Regions:
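A donor-sugar binding/catalytic signature common to diverse glycosyltransferases
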Residues: 75-84, 215-258
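Conserved acidic residues
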Residues: 61-63, 78, 102, 153, ...
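Hydrophobic/aromatic beta-strand patches that form the interior of the parallel beta-sheet core
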Residues: 33, 65, 81-82, 103-105, ...
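Active-site and donor-binding regions of nucleotide-sugar-utilizing enzymes
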Residues: 6-141
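Conserved catalytic-core segment of nucleotide-activated headgroup transferases in glycan assembly
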Residues: 13-28, 134-202, 272
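Catalytic binding pocket for nucleotide-activated donors in carbohydrate/polymer assembly enzymes
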Residues: 121-129, 205, 234-276
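Catalytic donor nucleotide-activated moiety binding site of glycosyltransferases and closely related
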Residues: 31-46, 181-214
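Nucleotide-activated donor-dependent transferases that construct or modify glycoconjugates
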Residues: 1-11, 156-157
Length: 276
């Protein structure tokens, strides 16, 4: 009898994170089903199994529940596994034990060391450094040399939703001004929890030079652009894997891999520098 697994999502981005896990489960002869407590179920493929009630989950009787979310229902059958929903961007509570999980599948050595140190103290969960499943198919796609910069260049503008770290409102007027000039093309996308007022403001900027994207998998946008502008979003760490430049506004953890600015007046100049 095939082993059952449950993939648990609370946002649409769970699909991009957990589909590689589903592929691995199927390759080993197992069966995966999905359960959502938020958006995402509507984007499942015909060959993907959806459970919609806790009774169905109990009958499925998974040996493991895997999620990128920070919490999971403790009464679902199976070992609880967290794969994370992004790289560490330097925000508070990235390393935070909530008592939901039996296993943390960490993305790299830094997280592994910190989680193992806690595991040694509390003793109620395990840690295995697995890498991040969302990146697996993407790394195969970006192999090879960087393509030349488009003319005009295309910029991906992405912001986190956290009010303390988001630069969306601060840079709105500059994005508005620059998107009307035509020097560059823009694709704008936000974290799904971004304020709907902010989303509406940027969506209203759409014109021949700017497109607002609702893609649930931001990785699909990376091949379409030449650089990223962001703030303290974990998505910029994903983008850096492409070796394309990133301009940030008041990043919490700046470094030589970023062109970090602290004044909207520097935005256009930093963007030109990144593209040069």
């Amino acid at each position: 009898m095939a082993k059952h697994y449950l993939l648990y999502g609370s946002e649409r981005y769970a699909l991009a994170i957990l589909r590689p896990v589903q592929e691995a489960i199927r390759a080993r002869g197992g069966e995966a089903a999905w359960f959502f407590d938020g958006p995402g179920a509507e984007d499942l493929h015909p060959d993907e199994k959806l459970l919609t009630t806790t009774e169905e989950v109990r009958r499925w009787n998974a040996i493991a529940v895997t999620t990128g979310s920070k919490a999971v229902p403790h009464f679902f059958p199976g070992v609880k596994v967290e794969t994370f929903h992004g790289f560490d961007a330097g925000k508070p509570r990235h390393i935070y034990i909530r008592g939901f999980f039996d296993l943390y599948c960490t993305t790299g050595p830094r997280d592994t060391a910190q989680f193992k140190a806690i595991a040694d103290k509390v003793g109620h969960f395990s840690v295995v450094e697995t890498g991040w499943p969302k990146i697996d198919p993407f790394m195969q796609e970006i192999a090879g040399d960087l393509p030349p910069v488009r003319q005009p260049p295309v910029i991906l503008y992405h912001s986190t939703f956290s009010p303390s770290w988001s630069a969306a409102e601060t840079l709105y007027e500059e994005v508005k001004r620059l998107s009307r000039i035509g020097e560059w093309k823009w694709i704008v996308t936000f974290h799904p929890k971004m304020s709907q007022d902010t989303v509406a403001k940027f969506r209203a900027l759409e014109n021949e030079h700017l497109r607002f994207a609702d893609d649930d998998n931001i990785l699909e946008l990376f091949p379409q652009v030449d650089m990223m502008c962001s703030d303290t979003s974990s998505a910029l760490n994903e983008f850096l894997l492409t070796y394309k430049p990133v301009v940030t506004f008041k990043n919490r953890r700046p470094g030589p891999q970023l062109l970090d600015i602290d004044d909207p007046a520097q935005f256009a100049g930093a963007t030109r520098t990144a593209l040069s």
